Swiss-Prot record:
Coiled-coil stretches noted in the UniProt entry, renumbered to this chain: none
Gene: rpmB
Any one GO CC term of the record: ribosome
Top-level taxon of origin: Bacteria
PANTHER family with a match to the protein in the record: 39S RIBOSOMAL PROTEIN L28, MITOCHONDRIAL (PTHR13528), LARGE RIBOSOMAL SUBUNIT PROTEIN BL28M (PTHR13528:SF2)
Protein name stated in the entry: Large ribosomal subunit protein bL28
GO biological processes: translation
Native organism taxonomy: Bacteria, Bacillati, Cyanobacteriota, Cyanophyceae, Gloeobacterales
Single GO term (MF): structural constituent of ribosome
Keywords assigned: Ribonucleoprotein, Ribosomal protein
Sequence similarity: Belongs to the bacterial ribosomal protein bL28 family.
Length: 81
């Protein structure tokens, strides 16, 4: 799987690490991704998704199906058996 949030699409950002002498080296700022098991009310089962911590906080305010619909995600593929 790619290092990308399934609901928000967050992924790594290209950045520089800058030393005191201002020498710059390219590096990646990785998104804080976590595998989460979330209860799906409509299907009555758990769904396992790779989410950013921002998406986990957003799930407290919005429904899982609303976010999945925006992302074009079919939750039936990620059902935990």
């Amino acid at each position: 799987m790619s290092r990308k949030c399934m609901l928000t699409g967050k992924k790594a950002n290209n950045a520089y690490s800058v030393s005191f002498s201002h020498r710059r080296n390219k590096r990646l700022q990785m998104a804080n991704l976590q595998w989460k098991r979330i209860w799906d009310d409509q299907q009555g089962c758990f769904v396992r998704l790779k989410l950013s911590t921002k998406a986990i906080k957003t799930l407290e305010h919005r429904s899982l199906h609303a976010l999945a619909k925006e992302a074009g995600l079919d939750l039936s593929k990620y059902v935990v058996k």
